[in-house]
Curated annotation (Swiss-Prot):
Its cofactor is coenzyme F430. Keywords: Metal-binding, Methanogenesis, Methylation, Nickel, Transferase. This is Methyl-coenzyme M reductase II subunit alpha. InterPro entries: Me_CoM_Rdtase_asu, Me_CoM_Rdtase_asu/bsu_C, Me_CoM_Rdtase_asu_C, Me_CoM_Rdtase_asu_N, Me_CoM_Rdtase_asu_N_sub1, Me_CoM_Rdtase_asu_N_sub2, Me_CoM_Rdtase_Fd-like_fold. Pathway: One-carbon metabolism; methyl-coenzyme M reduction; methane from methyl-coenzyme M: step 1/1. One of its GO terms (molecular function) is coenzyme-B sulfoethylthiotransferase activity. Coenzyme M binds at residues 335, 446. The keyword Signal does not apply. It comes from Methanocaldococcus jannaschii (strain ATCC 43067 / DSM 2661 / JAL-1 / JCM 10045 / NBRC 100440) (Methanococcus jannaschii).
Amino acid sequence: MDVEKKLFLKALKEKFEEDPKEKYTKFYIFGGWRQSARKREFVEFAQKLIEKRGGIPFYNPDIGVPLGQRKLMTYKISGTDAFVEGDDLHFCNNAAIQQLVDDIKRTVIVGMDTAHAVLEKRLGVEVTPETINEYMETINHALPGGAVVQEHMVEVHPGLVWDCYAKIFTGNDELADEIDKRFLIDINKEFPEEQAEQIKKYIGNRTYQVSRVPTIVVRCCDGGTVSRWSAMQIGMSFITAYKLCAGEAAIADFSYAAKHADVIQMGMILPARRARGPNEPGGVPFGIFADIIQTSRVSDDPAQVTLEVIGAAATFYDQVWLGSYMSGGVGFTQYASATYTDDILDDFVYYGMDYVEKKYGLCGVKPSMEVVKDIATEVTLYGLEQYDEYPALLEDHFGGSQRAGVTAAAAGCSVAFATGNSNAGINGWYLSQILHKEYHSRLGFYGYDLQDQCGAANSLSIRSDEGLLHECRGPNYPNYAMNVGHQPEYAGIAQAPHAARGDAFCLNPIIKVAFADDNLIFDFKWPRKCIAKGALREFEPAGERDLIIPAA
């Protein structure tokens, strides 16, 4: 690739204010932690709060290893022009990352056909577009916490739950035309024509409700609460809209359908050692996460679609799931942000896609080990050569496992672009890790590559303990639950073949449609831009409590 075309050079020059190829730099001249405006702000706030804390010591950057011996880097959010401080990418400091997680956790999808069948066949009540519209108006009152069946019921302040609503979608164009547009996710409107036809073919005449439970609920409770909150209000709304008796036996069928039989969760329940209910990050399969991200509706660039999935997944899986649920603390942000900052992964992925297009064409070759070896080797060596040639790039990705993850992600995605096959893609990742280890004798921290050493052996069989198609694997897949710097890239490798083929969805068309919704708080079409807004403090989240606390 021509030097002037390398995507990461602009960021490196801005960050370090020196030639990215310079082999020597300076230390101890930057003013320590004071070079960072954000850390100066942290210290100022901490000093004010010590008295409020009764004198208990608080944030003090002079404790521990001296900060700021080197340049405290800013980070360019890849695919944008925004440069931000690293601290503002920690999920606690970034309202957009928090909302990304909340919007997934607070979503549940419920099939409406069972409930409609109970109404018509068991109770003799006619279901029409008019009654569906009346029900949807009722559920949009009840779901945020409004009472419909009994009086003397306490209700929730609308100002706290303004983000809560329900919508409906169907693959039946005639029914969709009759639904009040305020409630409809219109497949024909939201998707390009070819994608819309593909999705409607899969969904058919079935009808689904999407419930967005209030953000404040998943802040106080957990993802497992969401289907219950939704089901309770669905039951009350059916009783009201169809004028049913609250105590009759058929109501149990509504409850069962809304809580269990027709429920589609975003994430599966986790085992006891991880102890999380449904709709928590650790239970979201990679293919489902790829479908949650909506870039494929608005871009036909396979690399861009894939990179947006990886960027969002880095915050979701590495920063929040592994970095907080499973670990806690501050260190995981640096691992995760390597995949969505400074256009480094973008450069490697576009290099790989260009190589594929020239030699094979997108989806132009059947998967084979020879193809995996060729593409993964080419892209891996390109990435490693950049780290050799540009010391500033090495400083940017200062951890070996950052470099391994980024290089292997580009290799795996490139193989997937060529073959249209996620299994080939994940083997491209595994091979890249092995090549990288041959090149440098090690990758990152001890055990980083543990899962990669055994990956190829169990990716070519479908077994209950080690198998699964790649799109169906997730953070709790046995060998994938171990280490940071893998799961976001795996989500990208799940997306890459479908992006290359121009598929409307990756794993589940119902999930894809559910998030094709402009009323969501987080922008799932352009996650990296949204994360940048969060870092720049320009993002307005939901779930705030200003209405019920003293004015500042």
